[in-house]
Every structure is written in C-alpha cells, then in structure tokens.
Amino acid sequence: TNSLNAEVLSDAATIHITSNKFTQSIDHIKYFAEMNPYNFGRIAYLHSQNDILSAGSEVNSFSVSLGLPYNENEAQKYFLEYFMQGINSESEIDKSIFASGHTYTSEEPGITINMNGIKILDTFKNQAVEGDLIYLTKPLGIGFLMAAFNHNSINLTARVYEKIINNMLISNKSAFAIAKKYNAKPLTDISGFGLGSHLIDICKSSNLSASLKLNREIVIDGCLEDLKLYKSSAYEDNKNNAISEIEILDDNN
C-alpha cells in the first residue's frame, strides 16, 4: 500500500504549538462490515474527538493509521479514499491539522487515530462535588445493540439501526461548548469502558458515591429487552472491573 500512501497520506508534519497545555490521545475502532466506509471514517474521527473533548481540550491535529482489507489494489484504494474522506469531513469542522498517516493490510480493517488537543478547560476526575447531577450527551446502548444487530435480533429494526448510526455521527462539540460556558466538570468519555466504570473512577477520585436509575429514556429507542439478551464485546471485562463497586437495589425496574 506504499504507492497509495503517497497519494493521500503524508509521512510527517511540523506543528507549531503556542499553548503549554497539550493533550494527546490514541484510539482504535474496528470496521463495521455493514457500514459504508465514509461514515465509518467520520465515526472514527468523532470517537477520538470524544477523548480530547472530555479532557477539556479542542482538537488541534491528528495522525491516522488505516487497516485496509486484504483485497485487490482497487478495493484498498476505495477504502483508503472513503475512510479519509469521512475523517477529513469532520476534521474540517474542527479546523484541525492532518499531520501524517500510514496504511497496512489486515483481516480486521479499522482506523487508529492519534489526536492532539489544546487544553482550554481544566477538568479532572476528582472535581465532582456532592449534589452534582450526571448529564449524558447521548443515549446509551450502542455496544449491546450492535451485538444484537450482528446476531440478527428480531427486536432490532432498520429504524433502530439507523438511530444507532445517527447517534455515532453526532459530534459532542456542542455539548462541550455548553460545559465550557457553565464551567461544568468533571467530564468523561464513557465509550469503551462504559458509564459504570467511568463513573466509578470519578466517584473514587472525588470520594463520593452516585445513584443511577436505568430506564428506557436513557437507552437508544428504549431497547431494554435486548440488554438482557446480548452483550457488547467489552461486557465481560467491564462487568468484572465494576461489579464489586456497584449495588443493585432493584433488578426488576
């Protein structure tokens, strides 16, 4: 894929930083076989953007590593082109710098983004105080609903699947702007380790406890039925890491 790299991806870039508060994050996301690669590129960028925003920063620059499928050169070129078009469509909104890129072939295509940000809001896990409210910027459930989709759940209609994709295509920039305006903190990105694990980290750091009520309103399309039937790929690890810190008061509601 080296010849393809030369057309689309640079090897390196020089970035001039005027702030002394620099944030960096790296994130990888595996390709959803049913999704068009343009939207997947957008989702991969926004997935990484969440880490930067939750650190109280705005995106400055990024580098990408693209895992392309084992295919003929034209197919690889297709994925490379549309992955990057999706990524660039979101980076243009951020006015962020595309610094460098790399490609490789893989049985599990995916996108890794190393993203840099400039810190504009001091937010740390130990800043929660008693009486704080927990605000979710999006409904929960992408992990287990994607698992339900992959297992052909009869409860998961095309309309619900569209809601899942549309949720992933929404940036949290507007939510971050509100947090900045009202100096809300701490912030966290709950993708990956889930709401439970991230909230436990905040509570431990702030010497507090938190109370949650799971209801249909905070899950995409109210799909609680599939929650008991399907598990996300990270479910077991997340459960094992968090279960000793959680007290379930009523399992029926």
For each predicted feature, which ranges?
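Hydrophobic alpha-helical membrane-association signature
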Residues: F40-A44, F79, F83, N167, ...
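Glycine-/charge-enriched secondary-structure boundary and capping motifs
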Residues: N71-I97, Y104-P109, K181-L187, S191-N253
